[in-house]
């Protein structure tokens, strides 16, 4: 059955499983980088607690770099696919070339921040000189060699735009394997490689990213024959750049909100480095679980969008129903694992002084996974039905408008000694449940306006 016929005729429940599994695996793989780094760093013989705290503080910048790279790639992907569909190979070459030009600009900004901005950034979140030193070392390496993750994101979308997503997954696997192999060698010092500690973790990460980017560059040059390649096509075209960001900017904003939320939470938890570290470690576990929902969302959106395009009310309704059911099943599994085995995760990271805070955070915040997963599914449904504004509203509620003021208010009671740190963790389930209620109202409205009117 051809891809078009599958989207038209295959039962939606089977289609969602078939499309969702590869995307879920791909998204889960992206979360491996952060978990692997923290696990190996947490088991360093000396300074592991400070190193884990440092990794927690640098994480928002890493997320922001990825957000800008992926958002630019999303805009490139959509514009390139549309241009190729129109048969305009020359414009397609310019789109690809301009995306690479933008990649260079993004890298230059990251490089300059890595040289001049890391001290001020780390110092804004801690006064511990050991944590500042480790955070600066790690973040400087990640920023100065950030061309790996930036160009991986762009080449990934260039391959996906021409239907070659399998090759981008291969690149992800290679990068993850390289990172996992190099982490213990460079962190602990094995064979002729000296012990480098937290710097070794940074080098292992960026080498894995560069390996992925290099492999995807080769795939791009060898396989993407639908349009020409060449330095000449990198000449900036303001019209094309505007088109790329007209599509990609909402994706950048949505991803950047996550970075802002983590940074502000680090500031709120500044009174307790152990609580900061616990939150950072838990966030990486949470990201792994929620990335399962993100992967399924990437199947929900095209299935419902295709059905919307063919005016099939039944397939839209099936897409919404099965998308929510499968998301809830995934999140129930995630909640079960994190509620039953918090101690195992603490051992994986060798959480040390942060152990009690980490287990407390896991037991409370993981309650929110089901509501968070539903919110992610809602956003995929909105996007499929041209509801970009509704999707942005949910992002703002979850990552800015509710969570940060609530956590800030709760932290006042904690700092005054009236309540324990666990009070701050309750801000997450409250936020996700509230956003889920708003999301349900928005879903009813968008179904009434966009779906019920279909013939």
Q: Predicted regions span which residues?
A:
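Transmembrane helical elements of multi-pass membrane transporters/channels
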Residues: 18-37, 141, 175, 208-212, ...
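Short alpha-helical transmembrane segments in multi-pass integral membrane proteins
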Residues: 1-20, 80-147, 193-248, 304-368, ...
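Small-residue hotspots at the loop-to-helix junctions and early N-terminal turns
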Residues: 49-60, 135, 139, 273-288, ...
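Helix-terminus/linker motif at the lipid-water interface of multi-pass membrane proteins
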Residues: 28, 32-53, 122-129, 185-196, ...
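Short runs within selected transmembrane alpha-helices of multi-pass transporters and secretion channels
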Residues: 73, 142-160, 168-176, 201-216, ...
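Transmembrane alpha-helix boundary and packing residues in multipass membrane permease domains
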Residues: 23, 27, 39, 78, ...
């Amino acid at each position: 059955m051809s891809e078009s016929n599958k989207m038209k005729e295959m039962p939606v429940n089977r289609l969602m499983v078939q499309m969702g599994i590869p995307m879920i695996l791909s998204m889960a793989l992206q979360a491996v980088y952060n978990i692997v780094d923290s696990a190996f760093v947490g088991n360093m013989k000396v300074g592991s607690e400070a190193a884990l705290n440092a990794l927690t503080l640098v994480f928002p910048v890493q997320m922001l770099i990825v957000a800008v790279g992926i958002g630019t790639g999303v805009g490139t992907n959509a514009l390139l696919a549309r241009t190729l569909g129109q048969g305009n190979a020359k414009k397609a070459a310019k789109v690809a070339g301009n995306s690479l030009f933008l990649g260079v600009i993004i890298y230059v900004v990251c490089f300059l921040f890595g040289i001049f901005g890391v001290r001020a950034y780390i110092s804004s979140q801690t006064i511990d000189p050991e944590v500042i030193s480790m955070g600066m070392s790690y973040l400087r390496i990640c920023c100065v060699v950030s061309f790996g993750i930036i160009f991986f994101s762009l080449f990934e979308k260039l391959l996906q735009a021409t239907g070659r997503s399998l090759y981008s997954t291969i690149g992800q696997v290679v990068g993850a394997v390289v990172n996992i192999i190099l982490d213990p060698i460079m962190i602990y010092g094995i064979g002729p490689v000296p012990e480098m500690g937290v710097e070794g973790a940074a080098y292992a990460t960026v080498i894995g990213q560069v390996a992925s980017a290099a492999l995807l560059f080769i795939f791009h040059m060898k396989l993407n024959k639908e349009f020409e390649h060449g330095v000449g096509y990198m000449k900036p075209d303001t019209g094309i750049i505007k088109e790329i960001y007209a599509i990609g900017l909402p994706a950048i904003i949505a991803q950047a909100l996550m970075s802002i939320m983590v940074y502000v939470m680090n500031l709120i938890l500044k009174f307790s480095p152990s609580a900061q570290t616990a939150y950072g470690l838990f966030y990486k576990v949470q990201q792994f679980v929620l990335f399962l929902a993100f992967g399924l969302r990437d199947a929900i959106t095209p299935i419902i969008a295709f059905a919307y395009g063919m005016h099939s009310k039944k397939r839209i309704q099936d897409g919404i129903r099965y998308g929510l059911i499968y998301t809830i099943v995934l999140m129930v599994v995630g909640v079960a694992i994190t509620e039953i085995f918090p101690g195992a995760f603490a051992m994986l990271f060798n959480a040390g002084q942060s152990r009690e805070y980490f287990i407390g955070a896991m037991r409370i915040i993981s309650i929110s996974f089901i509501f968070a997963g539903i919110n992610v599914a809602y956003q995929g449904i909105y996007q499929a039905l041209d509801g970009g504004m509704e999707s942005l509203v949910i992002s703002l509620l979850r990552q800015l408008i509710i969570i940060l003021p609530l956590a800030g208010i709760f932290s006042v009671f904690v700092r005054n000694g009236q309540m324990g740190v666990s009070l701050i963790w309750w801000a997450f389930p409250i936020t996700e449940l509230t956003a889920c209620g708003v999301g349900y109202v928005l879903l009813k409205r968008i179904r009434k306006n966009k779906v019920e009117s279909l013939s």
